[in-house]
Regions:
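Mid-domain, small-residue-enriched loop/turn segments at the edges of structured enzyme/sensor domains
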Residues: 50, 122, 143-225
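Active-site SXXK
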Residues: 61, 72-101, 292
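Active-site-proximal loop and beta-strand segments within enzyme catalytic domains
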Residues: 88-131
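Acidic helix-start/capping segments at beta-turn-to-alpha-helix junctions
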Residues: 58-59, 97-114, 148-150, 172-176, ...
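Bacterial N-terminal signal peptides that target proteins for export
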Residues: 1-13
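Structured C-terminal helix/loop/strand segments within mature extracytoplasmic catalytic/sensor domains
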Residues: 29-41, 148-150, 200-355
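Bacterial N-terminal signal peptides
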Residues: 11-22
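Beta-lactamase-like hydrolase cores
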Residues: 26-70, 320, 324
Length: 355
């Protein structure tokens, strides 16, 4: 990105001192954010492309955003919407992890994943299909999940939790089964905003699957996690923790932090197109959980190596944010359903999706 345009991408840092903070603590807090602002701007200035991001620490008021409400191409990050819909369906008894889905001859598609190399017909459990979709971003598995739950139902689910700009358009590398919106040509497989993708990942991390009994329609009041919720979220969060592609958000965090013990400290889902690299992640810092949704697009580097500039830029931004907010490093022991954050502990004061 050219330095002359930098002002258009300056991050908005929301870190207001809450009532009761001492002056010394408030000054130190702002000093951290000032340093983070400088570092983020330097990373942006060096990148040959565009950047949109949203990050928030869930148990504090740390927040950073750059074009966070701008609709962007999600690439495979839209698969998080499929995962969340599946989680709710399993929790409500309309789907089961061990139900069988069959990949028939001629249904496999190429690109990321491995199922297109397998002989067909092939029978897989729903859990296996979703695991392949998340861990290796398998496109064939994604289409199997879409066939199971339906595009309209998946989109209705995201809309019901306040994600108005998050939309799955079609199956991967398959013709659309009906008319497509006019903006399909711009976004391809799916669209969202960094803020909405972060909110979706937060729903998964907090294990918010059910509305409060009697909650008015359209409200984001979720029931506290119970044992049945946790059982579902344990499975889904395990998929995200075992993400195979770790060259973006985890890249410098895991290699630099030797204090992580007792579990994986990052759960994430990546997305890639020729000119797009993206990652949406939960990062468990010793100071508390963070959600990051970082999108680079219109990138000059179209290469498909681990040193692609978009991937490295995401890694640098993630390291800057996490290091500023959790100088002590990561803590994998806390990456469990609910994220160890009590109801009402987030910066929003509710735990509801923050629009």
């Amino acid at each position: 990105m050219r330095s002359g345009r930098l002002r258009n991408y300056l991050p908005t840092l929301a870190l207001c001192a809450v009532a009761g903070l001492g002056a010394a603590r408030a000054v130190a807090q702002h000093s951290v954010e000032d340093g983070l602002t400088v570092e983020i701007n330097q990373i942006i200035a060096a990148h040959h492309g565009k950047i949109a991001l949203y990050a928030r620490q869930l148990n504090s008021q740390h927040e950073v955003e750059i074009d966070s409400t701008k609709p962007v191409q999600t690439a495979s990050d839209i698969k998080l919407a499929i995962l969340y819909d599946a989680m709710v369906e399993v929790r409500e008894g309309r789907a089961k992890w061990d139900e069988r889905l069959t990949l028939k001859p001629g249904e496999a598609v190429g690109g990321s994943g491995m199922l297109h190399f397998f002989d067909t017909p092939l029978s897989l459990t729903l859990k296996d299909v979703l695991t392949m979709m998340v861990v290796v971003s398998d496109n064939t598995a994604t289409n199997m999940a879409i066939d199971r739950f339906g595009i309209d139902a998946i989109n209705a689910r995201t809309e019901s939790v306040g994600l108005a700009n998050t939309h799955l358009y079609k199956k991967v590398f398959k013709p659309a089964e009906g008319p497509l919106p006019a903006d399909y040509a711009t976004f391809g497989l799916g669209k969202s905003t960094p803020r909405e993708m972060a909110n979706l990942m937060e729903l998964i991390g907090r294990c918010e699957l059910r509305r409060q009994p009697g909650a008015p329609a359209g409200t984001m009041d979720f029931a506290p996690m119970d044992a049945d919720d946790k059982a579902v979220c344990d499975v889904a969060l395990g998929m995200l923790e075992n993400q195979f592609y770790r060259e973006t958000v985890p890249r410098y965090l895991e290699s630099a932090d030797v204090t992580t013990t007792g579990g994986v400290a990052i759960a994430s889902k990546t997305g890639s197109l020729d000119a797009v690299r993206a990652d949406v992640a939960i990062v468990m810092g010793k100071t508390g959980p963070m959600v990051l949704a970082i999108f680079t697009y219109d990138n000059a580097d179209h290469g498909w190596t681990v040193d692609n500039e978009g991937e490295v830029t995401i890694a640098k931004l993630a390291k800057a944010i996490v290091t500023a907010w959790s100088p002590g490093g990561l803590d994998g022991k806390l990456l469990v359903p609910g994220l160890g954050v009590a109801d009402g502990a987030s910066a929003t004061g509710t735990g509801a999706v923050k629009k």
